[in-house]
Amino acid sequence: MKILNVKFYLALAIALIVLQCEDNDSEQNASSNCGIETTYIKDVDNIDSLGNASGSTILMVDDCSYVGVGHRAGVPWITKFNELGEQVWDKKFDEIPIPQGNYGTGLIYATGVDKTNDGGFVIVCATTMNHPSYNASGRIMKVDSSGTTEWIREFPTNRPYHGRDVIQTSEGDYIVVGSWYTTSAVTNEKSAFMARYDVDGNLIWIERYGGECDEDEFQAVIQKPDGGFIAVGKFEHESSDYNCDFYGYTDLWFVSTDSEGQVLEETKTGESYWESAYDIIDLGDGTYGLAGRRRHQRQKPSNAWYIRMDQSGNVLSEWHEPDYVNSSGKNDALYDLILLPDGETAVALGYKDDGNGDSQYLWAFNARTSEEIWNASYNEPGRGFALGISNAHDGGMIFFGKKETGRLKIFKTDENGMVMLY
């Protein structure tokens, strides 16, 4: 009888192992079957029934799909869609109150998202309102793989925080960066912040960074191989030559920290006027690509700007647009950056004023020499913008944008930025 029991349990164990292997194979096959070669520009689903949306960023997911975040009807919003741009599910965070105050209605919107180890997503948010009458601030939120809310945490202060980026760390917890509202233009409150949260949304630590002015902010963060972090953004000039209260001139700001958020190195790159960074990627060789903008002369327009930096924030190579000779190009910029699967090509998403309104634009660069390879425009009559580029499952790119109708669209291109419309 004992022998029969042993044989039974042994057979059961083998069966469970086989089933587990089949499940793993199914997951791997599902992932390996991704990559439908397609391009399109299409409306986000359910605009007519649920109202228009605004998108901030898109993230590629392992199950042949994507998630995007932004806001809809004044509150944060997340959506999941397949390779063809067809909606899988859609979630609006109605449990978060729409900000109301002395100057009308504001909104709270999702600005960043990252995958979590349990198959869900962590989301960071900002608010449009700083006035105390709104009592509004950004959030960090966790949802499961179906978009169901697991927890929501408001940033810890009675003043507005604006979360700009979030990542899951190699340790499994979360890092958020952004800026917070200071009480005056000239201040010692340090307006940029980095915060670390555990998997349950409990604050582990928060650090503030900056100088004497109120426009210091972080826009993006990545984790270094040693467990520390690099945050990038802008640092406002501070000296007797500059007036925090009026000019707001800034440098591109690169800050390297340890795992506890303590500054190890920082650099400020720029000339006399406006420079800033909006995104950073790891190039895989100990250097980093940054997307931003520069305006080195007050009478000249701002130029889109790609920079390659070493781990200390020193410029190794760079590209920027030439100055325009007319009034066009006043606010050209690169906002988001990805590295293509070849490991050699960086593609930046931004906008370019072509004289007829801002247009959605992609620029491709040799990631290391910073030489421009190609560029592509997706403009139509009227004003447009684009945000949130991601690698696509077929090797192309995917991002959010708005066109002449103001309706939010998903743009899907091939690896050369081309869209074939049939």
Predicted regions and their residues:
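Bacterial N-terminal signal peptides that target proteins for export
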Residues: M1-L10
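C-terminal motif of bacterial Sec signal peptides marking the signal peptidase cleavage site
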Residues: I17-Q20
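A sequence-level/structural motif corresponding to short, flexible coil/turn segments enriched
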Residues: E22-Y422
